[in-house]
Amino acid sequence: MINLQNLIRTNIRELISCAETKAEENVRDSQHIMLDANENPYNKPFNRYPSDDQIELKEELAKLKGVRTKEIFLSNGSTEAIDMCYRIFCQPKVDNVVAIEPTCELYRRYAYLNDIEYRSTLLDDDFQLNAAELLDACDKHTKLLWLCSPNTPSGNLLNVEEVEKVLKGFDGIVIIDEAYADFTRLQTFRERISEFPNMIVLNTFSKAWASAAIRLGVVYAQEAIISIFNKVSSPYHISQLTQEQGLDALKHRYDIEDWIKILLLERKRMILAFESLACCEKVYPSNANFFLAKMKEAQSVYDYLCEKGIHVRECSNVSLCGNCLRITIGSKAENAEILGLLRCYKSTK
């Protein structure tokens, strides 16, 4: 059993102890006369601050995902959630975090921004996790472990047994980024938050929910952790427009499911097509809305596509990804366009 209070930064513990609890009678209602927040009475409905607990959106999300509202925190994109993990748990210049490599670069970026030592352990050639190696990289100052499953840029799910070893073998917080989990039909760790009091699961409306523009991230964890996020978050950090668009997406979840089915079919078609391209050496298995392809001349192919107005991610400078491109699954028309161009590609050698 982890001691959550010992993991939290001292100044954050002091902030939480001083946090004011809003009395139930002071809950704001649109039917009330509200003269407490120095708002302008004109330009309704945009003159009022948004709901600070986002309860309507959380209730709909909880029903869909099979969790309680007290196990959900909504963030201004996943980036805010990542940053908050550092600010809540990691003491600058003292603590460190350990992540897998390669993975999402945001974990490293926000470690640097918060002056936290960032360590990493290399995945194997199949982009799989070795729990023992990850845990060996930890010391008494390691507060967070970062896992991403499905991972980026590789696209694969991490081995469940190895992830479980990490969760059971680490006394700090294990963060599992499941931004792309909606593209797999397998069980997610979000469904298992009751098992692991030291686990935080991240998700987002940017990927499967096709709502990147509204900047809405989701944190799932046991209530003890979520209550900390609630107490230290910025006030009114989720705009009313974002909350409304999030609710609208949830109401149209059957459309989302149809889009996912189409994307999964397109992913299968694209991978098969890439495997037959003369310029492609290998395509790695994917459980996301993208795939990683090892090319014979990645930089040349990348430049060629850019000249034609098609943007992909060049990954040659990423560990284990030499000569690789990461390709997002687009619409059928977009996918046909890139395949047509690559079939016409001429080697520069």
List each language-model region with its residue ranges:
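PLP-dependent enzyme catalytic core of the Aspartate aminotransferase-like
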Residues: E161, E307-K308, N317-K349
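Active-site pre-lysine segment of PLP-dependent enzymes
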Residues: Y112, L129-K140, P153-V174, E178-A208
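PLP-dependent aminotransferase-like
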Residues: L4-L7, Q91-L147
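Phosphate-binding glycine-rich loop
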Residues: K58-N96, N114
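N-terminal "arm"/small-domain region of PLP-dependent enzymes with the aminotransferase-like
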Residues: M1-K63
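Conserved PLP-binding catalytic core of the aspartate aminotransferase-like
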Residues: L263-L264, S276-K308
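PLP-dependent aminotransferase class I/II
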Residues: N198-S276, K282-V283
